[in-house]
Structures are given as C-alpha cells and as structure tokens.
Curated annotation (Swiss-Prot):
Transcriptional repressor. One of its GO terms (cellular component) is nucleus. It is found in: Nucleus. This is Forkhead box protein D5-C. InterPro entries: Fork_head_dom, FOX_domain-containing, TF_fork_head_CS_1, TF_fork_head_CS_2, WH-like_DNA-bd_sf, WH_DNA-bd_sf. The gene is foxd5-c. GO terms for biological process: anatomical structure morphogenesis; cell differentiation; negative regulation of DNA-templated transcription; regulation of DNA-templated transcription; regulation of transcription by RNA polymerase II. Its main location: nucleus. Residues 71-83 have a biased composition (Basic and acidic residues). It comes from Xenopus laevis (African clawed frog). Residues 20-34 have a biased composition (Acidic residues). The lineage of its organism: Eukaryota, Metazoa, Chordata, Craniata, Vertebrata. It comes from the Eukaryota.
C-alpha cells in the first residue's frame, strides 16, 4: 500500500513539472471536460482509479494520451501558422517596388543585351523577368517605358533592317551618355542627358555655329566669333560700280505691225508723263487719247538695260573701296581656323 502511494506521489510530481513547462502551450479547457488536466493534476487519484499495480486505469491513460495528442496538434498548428506568416512576409517583401527609375531599368536592359539594342517588347520582357513587382503589374507600366524611350535624348531609335522581320524599332544608348549615372550606380543619376548638337540632315551631317559641316561623331565644339566683316579672298572678283552691266534685250511682239520691237528702259523713264497736263474733258482730249498708244510703242525702239535701275541699289548694297580694304585687312589679322573643317 505504501508502494502505491509513493508511485502516485511520483506521478503527481511529474504532472506538476509538465504543467510548469507547457503552461503557455496548452489552452485552458472547461471544468466539466473529462480530459481536463486540472482533474488529474490537482485532484488526488482514488483507489478506484488505481489498478492492482498502482497505475492509472486505461480510461485515464487514454485521456492523458488524447490531451498530449491535442497539445501536439496545437504545436504543429502554431508552427504552420508561423510558416504561413513568414511565407506571406516574403511575398510582400518581393513585391516591393525596385529603387530604380524607368531610365535606369531601360539602361540595364540594353546594356545586358548581346547586341546592345532591344525593342520595346524586349525591354519589357527583361524587366518582367528580373523584377517580380513589374511582372505582376504588367502592362500598366509599358506606356511609361515607351514615353521614356521617346522623350529622353540618351536613347536612340534604330530602324529595323529590311531583311530582319519583326515589329518595332530597336533602341540603343547614345555613346556620349555613358557617364550619365554617378560612378556607374543606377540608383543615382547626375543630370538629364541632352545632345550637344542638333541633327539637321538625314545623312548624318550636323550644322555648327560658324556654318561648318562635320560628322556628328567628331566631338568638335565651335568657337564663338564676333560678328565682323568676313575676309574676302584676293582672287574673288568683286564688280565695281563703274563697270556697266551687260545689256538685257527683250523682244516684245507688236500686234499692230506684226514685227518684233526691242524695248528699252531708258526710253520708258525719259518719256514725259502727260497725266496732269490736261484735266478738262474736251473733244481734243478725247481725240488725242487714240494717239497715245502709238507714242508708247514708238518709244520702245532702243535696247532695255538695267544700268540706271541698279545704279542706286548697287551703291547701297556694295561697300566702297576704302571700306573693303579696311575690312580685308582686319579680317586677315583675325582669321580663326577650326580643326577638322573645310
């Protein structure tokens, strides 16, 4: 009998130790639950519960086993819940927007391509494969990629070759934009890249400030020169104001006589105007109007030249000899030569 009491006391001490260790893991059950741990821990087992060898009956043992089984399920459920939370946390961290601008993303895609050029669809495929954030939000950001390609000078459009089938043009980087990012880091950009010279012709010629034509690949910067008279070469023939211009003959058919008459501008200017001579309406004036066309026709009998017309305009347009000499001397002293230009 004493042996049975010692064994019961030993089991009771083990139960107290188990409660202290797993007190946080076990849920509190109701008082009427037959498998409640309180009914076995805080109550003294009776003789009816004990067997012949001083152990608990199978019914109580099954209760303890079920309690331990339920606690194991709760532990597995707790660990599973924590795993789900960790998994969800990883998914949320993967969907964070990358710290790169659209220009940086396009630059990365083009630089990692084999031929250093990609189409719009190729750029979008690269971004979607490398960044899951943009993969889930495609194609909402495709228009942003298209706008950045067309509005930034650092990207150059390359037409597709005739023998290369496909849709869309290629895009590549401007060779002068290699230093666009600070120390090669795509997180920071120094400033917006702008082309230094504007392309004016399709054949690749660029017009610079002093009206020189050079290829766009040559990095030449035109120097600013003051607005002065240009130097006139020595072999350049400048017409003098004393040299008469060649006569220009114009033949006009005459409907009255059927012959060609040669008109002269001097006779037109020398012809007196009689518009204000007679203002009264008389028979003589009316009869005299029929004779005026003959006078006009007879006055165009000489050669028509431009000497008198260009005499005044030539003096205004062309500088005098002294001005040309001074301009030529000052231009020879201040000639500026630009390398690489004709």
């Amino acid at each position: 009998m004493n042996l049975s009491q010692d064994s019961s006391a030993h089991h009771q001490s083990q139960d107290y130790a188990g409660v202290s260790d797993d007190e946080d893991e076990i849920d509190i059950l109701g008082e009427d639950d037959p498998c409640s741990p309180r009914s076995h821990i805080y109550q003294q087992p009776t003789d009816s519960d004990m067997g012949d060898r001083g152990v608990l009956s199978p019914s109580k043992l099954s209760c303890n086993e079920s309690a331990s089984h339920s606690s194991g399920e709760r532990e597995r459920g707790t660990s599973k819940h924590s795993l789900d939370t960790t998994t969800n946390g990883k998914v949320k961290r993967a969907l964070v927007k990358p710290p790169y601008s659209y220009i940086a993303l396009i630059t990365i895609a083009i630089m990692q391509s084999p031929h250093k050029k990609l189409t719009l669809s190729g750029i979008c495929d690269f971004i979607s494969s490398k960044f899951p954030y943009y993969k889930d939000k495609f194609p909402a950001w495709q228009n942003s990629i298209r706008h950045n390609l067309s509005l930034n000078d650092c990207f150059i459009k390359i037409p597709r070759e005739p023998g290369n089938p496909g849709k869309g043009n290629y895009w590549t980087l401007d060779p002068a934009s290699k230093d666009m990012f600070d120390n090669g880091s795509f997180l920071r950009r120094r400033k917006r890249f702008k082309r230094q010279h504007q392309e004016l012709f399709k054949d690749g010629l660029v017009m610079y400030n002093p009206l020189h034509y050079c290829t766009p690949n040559s990095a030449l910067q035109a120097q600013q020169i003051p607005m002065t008279c240009l130097a006139i070469p020595e072999n350049f023939a400048m017409p003098n104001h004393l040299v008469p211009y060649p006569d220009i003959n114009i033949t006009v058919p005459c409907p009255d006589q059927g012959v060609h008459r040669v008109l002269t501008a001097q006779d037109v200017d020398n012809h007196p105007s009689n518009s204000h001579s007679k203002c009264s309406f008389s028979i003589e004036n009316i009869m005299g109007e029929t004779k005026e066309p003959e006078k006009h026709l007879t006055s165009f009998n000489q050669n028509w030249n431009y000497n008198h017309l260009l005499q005044s305009s030539r003096l205004c347009l062309l500088p005098s000899g002294s001005h040309l000499a001074n301009a030529h001397h000052s231009a020879q002293c201040n000639l500026i030569k630009f390398p690489g230009c004709y």
